Amino acid sequence: MIRSVIRGVGSALPKKSLSNDEIAKFVETSDSWIVQRTGIRQRYIANENETTVSLGVEAARVALINANLTIKDIDCIILATSTPNHTFPASAVEIQHALGMSHGFAFDIQAVCSGFIFALTTGDAYLRSGVAKRILVIGSETFSRILDWKDRTTCVLFGDGAGAVVLEAQEIQSDVALECGILSAKLYSNGAYVNKLYVDGGPSTTQTTGYLRMEGREVFKYAVCMITDAVDDCFAAAGINSSQLDWFVPHQANKRIIEASAKKLGISMDKVIITVDQHGNTSAASVPLALTTAICDGRIKKGDLVMLEAMGGGFTWGAILIRW
């Protein structure tokens, strides 16, 4: 049977970082206030020449190098983003062209901060059904373009960046949890919560881009329950106990949400990958950025059991369990 295996990872960040102290120069806030409430110390902000596409291309190239593959080996590109270069066409086809790929197919997925989880699950289904053999799954965002930089409740939270993985179909001998690859995935959404986290504009309504708006306390309240339920469902689907987990790679939204989720799941914080302090919330790029960081610094090793999760506007949420 076929199982989807991550063959290589990569990431990209804009050249400029923006510290809390720098933000405090133009909105009423402070480094201590931001760190205490979010855990964020800095984030990266794209310049006028850096875009969702350019960051996605950079991350994809690194992932291909780490996978020891070229773009000719890829059948499909799936890009998770809420900040495309254009309303249409999909930014994925722009990445496809920039990478020199004229075969196969490419498309975008929009599930906000859960986007990478949705994209990776879609790629997994394509591989297992034989639609493709190798897929580039990318999360790339330039949320700085949709922030109201006068709103201290949101502008301190988000940053720009990209992460990518090469997903490959591999034949395994039996469907056992010790075999590497994606073991289970669970996706959910509920549109009843649209007004809790959204952008107040769009081509079909205001005909403007709009700004990100959020009810922070409400998002926190729902996030912990939704995240932990999805993770528990993933463990159950794979027939694995949470005590067997080696690493928890959560969406890097807010350190408080991460800590509360880990506590509710009974996961020790020394098993939790945290990059929100350096990157802020990079939406769909958050999980692959954190994953790449933990692989490149040697924490995640072959054979490790790794749980990915995310929750975003909509609400959308989900989790993926992987044997590395």
Curated annotation (Swiss-Prot):
Does the entry feature the keyword Mitochondrion, yes or no?
no
Q: Name one GO cellular component term.
A: cytoplasm
> Which keywords describe this protein according to UniProt?
Acyltransferase, Cytoplasm, Fatty acid biosynthesis, Fatty acid metabolism, Lipid biosynthesis, Lipid metabolism, Multifunctional enzyme, Transferase
Reply yes or no: does the keyword Metal-binding apply.
no
List locations, semicolon-separated: Cytoplasm
Q: Which domain of life is it from?
A: Bacteria
A Gene Ontology molecular function term of the record: beta-ketoacyl-acyl-carrier-protein synthase III activity
Q: What EC numbers are recorded for this enzyme?
A: 2.3.1.180
Q: In which pathway does it act?
A: Lipid metabolism; fatty acid biosynthesis
Q: Which GO terms describe its biological process?
A: fatty acid biosynthetic process; secondary metabolite biosynthetic process
Q: Which InterPro entries match?
A: ACP_syn_III_C, ACP_syn_III_N, FabH, Thiolase-like
Look up the signal peptide feature and give its range.
Answer: none
Identify the stretch(es) annotated as ACP-binding: 252-256
- Identify the catalytic residues: C113, H251, N281
Q: Which reaction does it catalyse?
A: malonyl-[ACP] + acetyl-CoA + H(+) = 3-oxobutanoyl-[ACP] + CO2 + CoA
Quaternary structure note: Homodimer.
Described by its record, this protein's role is as follows: Catalyzes the condensation reaction of fatty acid synthesis by the addition to an acyl acceptor of two carbons from malonyl-ACP. Catalyzes the first condensation reaction which initiates fatty acid synthesis and may therefore play a role in governing the total rate of fatty acid production. Possesses both acetoacetyl-ACP synthase and acetyl transacylase activities. Its substrate specificity determines the biosynthesis of branched-chain and/or straight-chain of fatty acids.
- Annotated family: Belongs to the thiolase-like superfamily. FabH family.
What does the UniProt entry state concerning the protein's domains?
The last Arg residue of the ACP-binding site is essential for the weak association between ACP/AcpP and FabH.
Q: What is this protein called?
A: Beta-ketoacyl-[acyl-carrier-protein] synthase III
Q: Which organism is it from?
A: Bartonella quintana (strain Toulouse)
